[in-house]
């Protein structure tokens, strides 16, 4: 398991775990370490995270994840 600290993570562990689960699920699909790392770059604010949302068939949750990622990046 890879861990990357986000500035807004303190007190938002639940949000972090929800967002991180997308990267974990994406890694489990492809079994490529670079995907797991890239998905978490810049506190999940990157195009890889979007690709992982689509790959895990969760793109309908994009607005919620956008808010959560913004909170974690703050």
UniProtKB/Swiss-Prot annotation:
Stored Pfam families: Crust_neurohorm
Recorded GO MF terms: neuropeptide hormone activity
Listed InterPro entries: Crust_neurhormone_CS, Crust_neurohorm, Crust_neurohorm_sf, Hyperglycemic, Hyperglycemic2
Superkingdom per UniProt: Eukaryota
Keyword Glycoprotein set for record: no
Keyword Disulfide bond appears in the UniProt entry: yes
Intracellular or extracellular location(s): Secreted
Residues modified to Alanine amide: 74
Disulfide bonds: 6-43, 23-39, 26-52
GO CC, any one term: extracellular region
Annotated GO biological process: circadian rhythm; neuropeptide signaling pathway
Keywords: Amidation, Disulfide bond, Hormone, Neuropeptide, Secreted
Protein family according to the UniProt entry: Belongs to the arthropod CHH/MIH/GIH/VIH hormone family.
Function: Inhibits Y-organs where molting hormone (ecdysteroid) is secreted. A molting cycle is initiated when MIH secretion diminishes or stops. Has little or no hyperglycemic activity.
Record protein name field: Probable molt-inhibiting hormone
